[in-house]
Amino acid sequence: MRFHALSLPHTVTTKEYCACAFTQKVLKLCAMLHRRGHTVYHYGHKDSIVECTEIVHVTDNELLKEAYGTYDWKKDFFKHNNADLAHQTFYKRAIVEVGKRKQKGDFLLCFWGQKPVADAHPDLIAVEPGIGCFNRTFAPFNVFESYAVMNCVYGIMENKNPAWYDCVIPNYFDPTDFEYREKKGDYLLFLGRLITNKGVSIVVDIAVRTGMKLIIAGQGDYRSIMGGQEPPPNVEVVGYADVAKRRELLAGARALIQPTYYNEPFGGCVVEANMSGTPVITSDWGAFPETVVHGTTGYRCRTMDHFIWAAKNIDTIKPKACRDWAMANYSMDRVVLMYEEFFSMLQDVSKGKGFYEIHQDRTNIDWLVKYRPSSFPANERVVWPIASVPSPAAPKGAPVGPVEPTTARNLEPLKPLEVEDDGFLGEVKMRA
């Protein structure tokens, strides 16, 4: 398969921009698809560091400075507007560069609502991947990062009949970015933008009521959202956390607390914490009912009483259950298989009979299986060994791409295990 990935006009596609979930989606999906042997063109900033076939330059620091001036995005929030100079220039340049490289049947991945580029290339298969905003969609095919955001967007659009070729595929994470640690420190952690809707005041209240140490990390100004108040003695505000600091904070925390007020589209920090073996405490709406296994990988709460109990009893959650859950369901190795199934479905629409295309060689429809910690063998870590799963688009015998081995892949083969689907069909048997 061939992909044209349009990055964000206002950021640089590197790991350094870890505070922007959308930038990280571009970075990782390009790598995931490229490792599987697909052709991937990345369109974005010339300083981007992306694993792909070609990095196509359509923006640079000079353009960003002209559009936004000089500001510290690590301290303040990202500046962006679809009508600004950076976005409009990105669109114009991307339209030209995509035109130089496209072939019939290619996919155009619009991560940031790049409708003008899609409109200029109607012969490409336009997809909005990883939708995580409550805005109307424009592409004929859409991937939502949670059922929560999909249903909310359908409601906004007054769409009572969902599209067969829209789907939900969760966000994906690189396990090598996180350190699994069973021995935890003495602090609770809040990680995210310092805005009212993220529930910063609730986190501080929990710390005050329990006397536990709390570390707050993220973009924004603490005092501006807390009425000018200084943090309590047991609360430390450390500002933006880069890749290394993020890794250390997540690995050492007793728990990550994310009591968001609003309908969280995904909440990636929850998965990052679980990959570090750290349990989570969240509100009970948005994507959290999909990502937090209550009582197993953390707790979901509705009242301050719930939050206090969860904080005091968080040590009952096993780090290994958190890690296994995140690795089995949200690692890059796992999620790329979901994307490949989705893109193969779209190829059927483009080249075949669409909904009625029957694949006689199909052996499973496991792409939507969700693996539960309670089903894991006690002494084994569960991952998806990507190197052993061929791409549906690759000819027989073709290599799957340059996949570096990891500790997880070098484990002994997994035994048969019981897994649950998403809860609608009960338990099913699957051989790993």
What label would you give each PLM region?
Residues 1-387, 397, 401, 423-432:
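Catalytic cores of nucleotide-sugar-dependent glycosyltransferases that transfer UDP/GDP/TDP-activated
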Residues 387-421:
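Acidic, proline-/serine-/threonine-rich low-complexity intrinsically disordered repeat tracts
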